């Protein structure tokens, strides 16, 4: 009997020992906090010049051998592939696998890669490393693994859901964006990826962030689906004071659209990864800010307490809006951030940077807190990131939203029925929504409008749009000084009931 008791105790002890070990964000946070207390050491590149100086076309030739995907021989729906170092991805990133009992470094091997026509000395690459990784999952078809996550460059990552193609990017952290001192780009220097079980439908990734003035520990839980959701937890530590901290940053591209048409003839009516910033403020207000490609750097701030959500969206999915068979902007996802817990007082900030082509990301959006702790103190941020093509789902059904913003030369119809330009700028704003569609066409919908000191609203009228079953606002505004920006706001109401989100537009200077 005593022998059986000892045997039972031994089994219980074994179970306890095996279940008590678990890798967590706290393990990464210890490293981040330790780094924050030390001086910053810039990463050193170990790349041969043939890789460091290569052009993008050459870098694209270095392809991962898909038959050597990590976890290929395991019964798990997730697979990993890796990015080779090259071009400006010139420093190695450590990548580890976390199992139920241990942490193991995933070792680099040139055998993972096909180098194409890139001429190189095989001896010089044998001790290199990875620049990042991608996650594959059968998201569109059960018998085909598609790339759903890409972690490459600084703290950038891209995510897609079913039927989507890569568009905008998310980042771990942004520092001093759009400040005269220049932006600092933190980087993920090491990753830990949990080996998923055969039945797992989610993948957990940990990351250690480092930069001259900040460190951080991150936990990403990736849940693929029609909308792919990433659950994010971060613990951030400042090494030194920063001018501005950008939390949950998103990076996108806007070249032109109907609110700011292409200056040259283009068969594509619109060209952008996102066309607006959507905000659900702490007080419940919904705000829509159409994006611009300004001639000068522009920063817009929306002060609030405890934001309920914000994101860069791609509203309007018809192929006819883009007409691009190669880059399929109509399939690029919107990204929506839902904070968890109270984020306190701060601002959702939008940065718009001039660009001449679509290869440059020129749009940044993030949350920046009003108060930052002293260096070394921990900051915690939790939020979900949803990548979706279903923009209706990212908005309250009882609140109509802006379907499109179109800009035109303002004019007045003469007695001879010919339209004559009158020196104004016209805006056509279409509002739609689930509840709005139920309103009778003769509902007395009106607009509440306002404009900043640099402009004057010459005319404002609202009419029912039978095509969209929504309402169309038509504005004519006169700008006083074209060298300055002009701010406008509008929302639809029915008596004392607000029917729509707030259209918040900035007409760029020198337009």
Swiss-Prot record:
Tell me yes or no: is Signal among this UniProt entry's keywords: yes
Q: List where this protein forms a coiled coil.
A: none
Recorded hits in InterPro entries, A to Z, give: Gal_mutarotase_sf_dom, GH-type_carb-bd, Glucan_biosyn_MdoG/MdoD, Glucan_biosyn_MdoG_C, Ig-like_fold, Ig_E-set, MdoG_OpgG
Record's signal peptide: 1-22
Disulfides per UniProt? none
Top-level taxonomic group: Bacteria
A GO biological process held by the record: beta-glucan biosynthetic process
Instruction: Output the SUPFAM superfamilies linked to this UniProt entry.
Output: E set domains (SSF81296), Galactose mutarotase-like (SSF74650)
Checking Gene3D superfamilies in the record gives: 2.70.98.10, Immunoglobulins
Give the Gene Ontology MF terms in alphabetical order: carbohydrate binding; catalytic activity
Query: Keyword set for this entry?
Result: Periplasm, Signal
Q: Which PANTHER family match?
A: GLUCANS BIOSYNTHESIS PROTEIN (PTHR30504), GLUCANS BIOSYNTHESIS PROTEIN G (PTHR30504:SF4)
Describe the task this protein carries out. Answer: Involved in the biosynthesis of osmoregulated periplasmic glucans (OPGs).
Designated name of the protein: Glucans biosynthesis protein G
Gene this protein is translated from: mdoG
